[in-house]
């Protein structure tokens, strides 16, 4: 988990009446709106808990580029969740 993971947790938990199934469905909708690279990086890092080093070997890109993609993905997901709460 990276420094932006808390942003998603806080966004999902901000509404006391937001149930887990609804939160998970909304998160999946938000992820589906991401460009392919951001979606892949987000899923590998957030859900599969892979390190950037491992992802960089798989995707053959720099760790810096991956961190930027992950950051953008988190910001887009957070914005999506805020619009749909």
Please give the residue ranges for each predicted region.
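C-terminal edge and immediately downstream basic/flexible tail or linker adjoining helix-turn-helix-like DNA-binding
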Residues: 1-6, 57-60, 71-85
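Amphipathic alpha-helical segment used for protein-protein interaction
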Residues: 2-40, 50, 54-57
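Short, locally clustered residues in the helix-turn-helix/winged-helix DNA-binding domain
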Residues: 31-32, 46, 78
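A short pre-motif secondary-structure segment
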Residues: 41-45
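Helix-turn-helix DNA-binding motif, specifically the short coil turn and the N-cap/start of the second
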Residues: 51, 60-65
């Amino acid at each position: 988990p990276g420094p932006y993971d808390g942003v998603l947790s806080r966004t999902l938990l901000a509404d006391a009446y937001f149930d887990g199934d609804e939160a998970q469905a909304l998160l999946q909708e938000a992820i589906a709106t991401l460009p392919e690279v951001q979606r892949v990086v987000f899923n590998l890092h957030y859900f599969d808990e892979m390190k950037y080093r491992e992802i960089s070997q798989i995707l053959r890109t720099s760790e810096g580029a991956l961190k930027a993609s992950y950051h953008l993905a988190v910001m887009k997901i957070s914005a999506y969740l805020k619009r749909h709460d």
